[in-house]
Design a protein with these regions (language model features):
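Structural motif
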Residues: 36-44, 91-95, 184-192
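A positional/architectural concept
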Residues: 12, 19-65, 69-72
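Short alpha-helical scaffolding segments that buttress acidic/His motifs in well-ordered protein cores
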Residues: 46-51, 100-104, 143, 194-198
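Alpha-helix C-capping/helix-to-loop hinge sites
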Residues: 34, 49, 53-54, 70, ...
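C-terminal accessory module of base-excision DNA glycosylases/AP lyases that mediates lesion recognition
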Residues: 1-34, 122-123, 137-208
């Protein structure tokens, strides 16, 4: 059975984690419930996540908003109508242009069925997405977490999560990607909720 988070399940999972983990309990008590940060499943969201690879959330959102304004409706066909210069103008790098076009072509030729992913287990969703060039662990994890609202996904290599953990624990060194995935094992089956709490801490602590 595929389980998806909603606001009610998010709160329940936060309370469960707070009982098990003092650090997450402190975040929850200090800053409250994290946002669900849900996104609509499908092509447009995957393009948005591709734009977020290795750049700030704000920078990616600016590029995505320009893209949507330019094409009005972001579909595979509409994206493929844009040339290199047009994509560069809205904020695509050469690499990301190739990734987005590859995704658009894969959707149009039936190489991937994004709707069908919604009913697959996490590991199968990741395997299907990672067949596409430019979509690796982080991109597929974020899609699972935000678009499909899966509760037990920890984005591999997410810098903000590593920084949040370093600050939360007052560590001299930031954990590596592999080290952090091992740390996250303690939060099963709610690793995606732990990630939301840590992002919430990362963003909220910067405002204090």
């Amino acid at each position: 059975m595929i389980i998806a988070l909603n606001e009610e399940k998010l709160v329940a999972a936060c309370l469960t984690l707070a009982k098990q983990d003092e650090d997450l309990a402190n975040i929850f008590q200090r800053f409250g419930k994290p946002p669900l940060w849900a996104r609509e499943p499908g092509f447009a969201t995957l393009v948005h996540i591709i734009l977020e690879q290795q750049v700030s959330v704000a920078s990616a959102k600016s590029a995505f908003d320009k893209l949507v304004k330019f094409v009005e409706i972001l579909t595979p066909k509409n994206l493929l109508r844009l040339n290199d210069a047009e994509l560069k103008a809205v904020g695509f790098s050469r690499q990301k242009t190739g990734y987005a076009r590859g995704l658009a072509e894969a959707v149009l030729n039936g190489k991937i069925d994004l709707k069908a992913l919604e009913s697959l287990p996490d590991a199968e969703v990741k395997a299907e997405l990672k067949k596409l060039k430019g979509i690796g662990d982080w991109t597929s994890d974020i899609y699972l977490l935000m678009a499909l609202s899966r509760p037990d996904v920890m984005p591999k290599g997410d810098l903000a999560l590593h920084i949040a953990w370093q600050k939360l624990k007052n560590l001299e060194l930031r954990p590596t990607s592999d080290e952090f995935l091992l740390i996250a094992e303690r939060w099963k089956p709610f690793r995606a909720v732990a990630a939301r709490l840590l992002w919430h801490f990362y963003l909220s602590a910067r405002k204090v």
